[in-house]
Amino acid sequence: MTIRDTGGLMKRTLILFLMLLAMAFPALSQAAGEGGERILDYAVTARVEEDASLVVTERITVSIEHKAIIHGIYRIYPVKIRENGDVLRHYGFEVLSAKLDGKDTPYSVTEEGYTAGVAMGDPESKAPRGSHTYELTYRTTGHVRFLPARDEIYYNVTGNFWKFPIDHVSFTLELPGGASPEAVTAFTGALGAKGAEYRMTGPSSLETTGALSPGEGITVAFGWKKGIVTEPEKNLSDFMGDNRALTLSAIPLFQLLLFLL
């Protein structure tokens, strides 16, 4: 009579099953993560007006699962930044329209500190599940820099405040008279990073070549020959208002100069 070692066979089968499960678990976890809420596509067109303002349209396609996105999305836009130490640079910001899948959608704007927040969506109802596109159009000022050799914009396309991954970003610049830029560069990654995960898709357009993690974005710099855009008159009162600390610190020096005269 032959006695079979079924216990050993069962043990080996169990070990093999556990090994296969361990190998499959990371893939399952990654697939689950990729299926979460995220920005699928972020397409931006910026038109430079002759008065140096920008009219920007952002088409943001998102995957909605009613986890973090319930009523809509929230775009945070920087309206003030510190440059060269204590100099405060101010960006004008005016929303022109907000749409969801091509139709007007409610929106509200709140400004706090150095940022303006735009809430897009109906606060009284849930946003539709699935893949949907929000379109935000706004006018902004202060982004064109008038340099000795050329003029340029230095523009944070997406901002660095999104809590979702961004799969793909594209950016197109439109200059007055159909002019083309002479110099283009871009930076990807966290605020201040110098990543270069992008490629040019035309003389005035580019796109990212890799996904952006939450908190990451893309900043572009486009330069063109002088004379295409009119430089606005410098407003001293605006500078003094935005840089109150510098203005006040200069008063004693001004008083001293008057005394010496």
Predicted features and spans:
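Positively charged n-region of N-terminal signal peptides that target proteins for export
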Residues: 2-13
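A short catalytic or substrate-binding loop motif that flags glycine-/basic-rich loops and adjacent residues
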Residues: 13-14, 38
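Bacterial N-terminal signal peptides
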Residues: 16-24
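Lumenal/extracellular ectodomains and adaptor appendage modules
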Residues: 27-260
